[in-house]
Amino acid sequence: MSIKHFLTLQDFSPAELKQLMLRAIELKKIQKSGEIFEPLKNKTLAMIFEKSSTRTRISFEIGMSQLGGHALFLSPRDTQLGRGEPIEDTAKVISSMADGIMIRTFGHEVVEKMAEHSQVPVINALTDDYHPCQLLADMQTYYEHRGSIEGKTVLWVGDGNNMCHSYINAAKQYGFKLRISAPEDYDPNPRIVEANQEYVEMIRNPMDAAENVDLIVTDVWASMGQEEEQKKREKAFKDYQVNTAMMQQANPDALFMHCLPAHRGEEVSAEVMDAEDSVVWDEAENRLHAQKALLEYLMAKA
């Protein structure tokens, strides 16, 4: 039997992604009711973190605990990875003992190589190219507040980064139109755009791009590893802040999302972050429920 991995949204069909979202909502209700539900009892998830994290670590650790399993935290300091052990060797060893591997790292090729040599499911918890777990939470959050996102129009404002790339994949998999508004020199990977071009439109002016959209999403201007570019990026992105004026260009029931952490006064104004149409806190909580559905799907029968 072939092993199922989750490296990008394209690893699952649209039907699987919808099933996963509905299951996440069910698991959320189960958890809120206080019912004990442990389909992953005696299962272990090895979590490899080469990038620091708040929401990812907490949500996966608590998720495994609530599902009856155990999560093992591994950093480069704790393993031979930090001393140069090949990824393929690490994958073979860890997958011979653990029931699943979650990895948060820099190069996407690291995750791909891990999956290639693993005997158990591998989950991409973020690379420089993609952040698919966040999209599971975002799509669940939109569904809970506004229903199906199919046929809607979403605006990504800011850096064409890993989150933007996953939104491009999501446009195809969930059936929405995606507008991307980024400064020159900060567009998403053209290869990823071209592969999904019928779902994606590039609009340089962010106020024009925001007109009549149903959801506006942004992220920090300087991601992890780009701190030295902070001043340069602040200058390049100064007209790309999501603020009240931009939200007023959108449809009256448009939502605002941000994967967090957010820098109020930079990529988003404090007013928008704390407004009624901001669902960032539900979005953050849904990392837990969406990933529980993913863990159950990949590991319960493995």
Swiss-Prot record:
GO terms for cellular component: cytoplasm. It catalyses: carbamoyl phosphate + L-ornithine = L-citrulline + phosphate + H(+). Its EC number is 2.1.3.3. One of its GO terms (biological process) is arginine biosynthetic process via ornithine. Carbamoyl phosphate binds at S53, T54, R55, T56, Q80, R104, H131, P132, C133, Q134, C259, L260, R287. The keyword Amino-acid biosynthesis applies. The keyword Amino-acid biosynthesis applies. L-ornithine binds at N162, D219, S223, M224. Pathway: Amino-acid biosynthesis; L-arginine biosynthesis; L-arginine from L-ornithine and carbamoyl phosphate: step 1/3. Keywords: Amino-acid biosynthesis, Arginine biosynthesis, Cytoplasm, Transferase. GO terms for molecular function: amino acid binding; ornithine carbamoyltransferase activity. It is found in: Cytoplasm. Its main location: cytoplasm. Reversibly catalyzes the transfer of the carbamoyl group from carbamoyl phosphate (CP) to the N(epsilon) atom of ornithine (ORN) to produce L-citrulline. This is Ornithine carbamoyltransferase. It comes from Hydrogenovibrio crunogenus (strain DSM 25203 / XCL-2) (Thiomicrospira crunogena).
